[in-house]
């Protein structure tokens, strides 16, 4: 009888444990855009490894993500794990919304710092503390028509900006009258910032307290940027290019400064006749030390400081960071992996078009890691467009840009001036 009672008690204990197991709430993961649509397809293997760890994915459109993140923080409704664009990370760190990860990274076998592109990893470190694990990477380089470059008399892409300035008018002529050489969308801040970095500009000064856009280095880069438009190499209006892919195929423009998402888009959208007539190349440099530097972009996975289940949240981050998951994620989304071992597993460096990104990612830098960067970037684009259209001169545009940036950074200066406690 005693044995029967013992067996019954054991069964009841197991049942109670199972009930508690089932009632355990799901870990919440917020993922953005296309990534949020497909990440659930990576999770079945995690469920097999850790039966008690359930994950509920919420997909958030990129257009609504920034406001939703801030609203969730204010309302105390942050998820456990979230995807964050690299330029948003400093803002969430300043709010105290994110969990520092260095102590977990130091013990992790799955996440190895030496397997990441250094410039991308650096974008996740704020004031010496790591807050994010890169999930996928993004940077900018040149897509170009190989046939038009050859028609211009160049066997391979130039590695200096001087070389491209010689090639672009010839490519434009080879494409025929009424066309342009290069597409640099007017409302993008990235081209002048990339050129500024290549020319050695710091963008901000005095500990990121003031704008530094009137510096000789940025002024030279900005003048070089404007020259593409003033020489008729790049279109001045948004209506000149109606459909990027159709116009690239027609030769409306021959070169495009853009990112890795267009690897898949070009392959899908260009006509079959152009399948072997386009390529990618790392950015040139002003002085011949190619590749020139580009931006350290992409998205990272972070753990909310408010999460009551930080160990489980970190387990999810580690899982999604595994090279095998990175490869599968690349196949689902076209997003370039953040880990170099995942690139090799997917044989990406062997693909000539992807290899250009592999090379470029060895030469990337993050934008200034301050919460105000998004507002500063918008101001750069605004004054850049005004100068392109001839509404402002170079000096007037940069003076106004510095003035606006100094206003944006006013609170930062005040906070940094306070005595440390």
What are these regions (language model features)?
Residues 168-170, 207-238, 283:
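Glycine-centered hinge/linker elements that transmit conformational signals in sensory
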Residues 45-116, 125, 150-152, 156-159, ...:
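Extracytoplasmic "Venus flytrap"/periplasmic binding protein-like
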Residues 152, 223-235, 243, 268-335, ...:
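Extracytoplasmic/periplasmic substrate-recognition and gating elements
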Residues 127-135, 140, 165-211, 253:
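Extracytoplasmic/periplasmic solute-binding protein
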Residues 102-116, 181-182, 201-220, 268-273, ...:
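Short, solvent-exposed loop/beta-turn-alpha elements that line the ligand-binding surface or hinge
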Residues 86-141, 165, 196, 275-281, ...:
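Hinge/lid segment of periplasmic solute-binding proteins
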Residues 71, 79-80, 109-148, 180-181, ...:
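A structural signal for short loop-to-beta-strand junctions that line the ligand-binding cleft
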Residues 119, 278-282, 330-382, 386, ...:
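Long, aromatic- and glycine/proline-rich binding clefts that accommodate carbohydrate-like moieties
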């Amino acid at each position: 009888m005693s044995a029967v009672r013992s067996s019954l008690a054991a069964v009841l204990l197991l049942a109670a444990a199972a009930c508690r197991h089932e009632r355990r709430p799901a870990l919440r993961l917020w993922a953005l855009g296309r990534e949020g649509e497909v990440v659930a397809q990576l999770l079945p293997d995690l469920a097999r490894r850790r039966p008690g760890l359930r994950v509920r994915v919420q997909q958030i459109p990129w257009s609504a993500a920034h406001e939703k993140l801030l609203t969730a923080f204010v309302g105390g409704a942050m998820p456990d794990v979230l995807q964050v664009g690299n330029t948003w990370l400093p803002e969430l760190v300043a709010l105290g919304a994110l969990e520092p990860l260095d102590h977990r990274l130091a013990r992790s076998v799955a996440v190895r710092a030496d397997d990441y592109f250094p410039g991308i990893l650096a974008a996740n470190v704020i004031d010496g503390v790591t807050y994010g694990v890169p999930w996928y990477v993004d940077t900018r380089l040149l897509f170009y028509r190989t046939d038009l470059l050859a028609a211009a008399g160049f066997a391979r892409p130039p590695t200096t900006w001087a070389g491209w300035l010689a090639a672009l008018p010839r490519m434009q002529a080879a494409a025929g009258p009424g066309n342009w050489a290069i597409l640099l969308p007017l409302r993008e801040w990235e081209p002048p910032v990339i050129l500024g970095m290549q020319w050695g500009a710091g963008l901000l000064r005095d500990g990121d307290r003031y704008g530094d856009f009137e510096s000789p280095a940025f002024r030279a880069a900005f003048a070089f940027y404007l020259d593409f438009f003033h020489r008729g190499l790049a279109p001045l209006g948004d209506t000149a290019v109606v459909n990027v892919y159709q116009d690239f195929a027609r030769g409306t423009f021959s070169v495009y400064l853009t990112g890795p998402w267009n690897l898949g888009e070009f392959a899908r959208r260009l006509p079959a006749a152009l399948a072997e007539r386009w390529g990618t190349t790392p950015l040139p440099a002003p002085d011949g030390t190619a590749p020139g530097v580009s931006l350290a972009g992409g998205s990272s996975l972070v753990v909310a400081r408010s999460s009551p289940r930080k160990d489980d949240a970190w387990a999810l981050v580690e899982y999604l960071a595994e090279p095998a998951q990175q490869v599968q994620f690349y196949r689902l989304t076209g997003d370039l992996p953040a880990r170099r071992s995942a690139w090799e597993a997917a044989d990406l460096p062997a693909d000539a078009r992807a290899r250009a990104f592999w090379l470029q990612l060895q030469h990337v830098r993050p934008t200034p890691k301050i919460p105000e960067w998004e507002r500063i970037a918008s101001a750069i684009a605004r004054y850049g467009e005004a100068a392109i259209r001839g509404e402002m001169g170079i000096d007037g545009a940069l003076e106004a840009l510095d003035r606006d940036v100094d206003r944006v950074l006013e609170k930062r200066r005040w906070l940094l001036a306070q005595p440390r406690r």
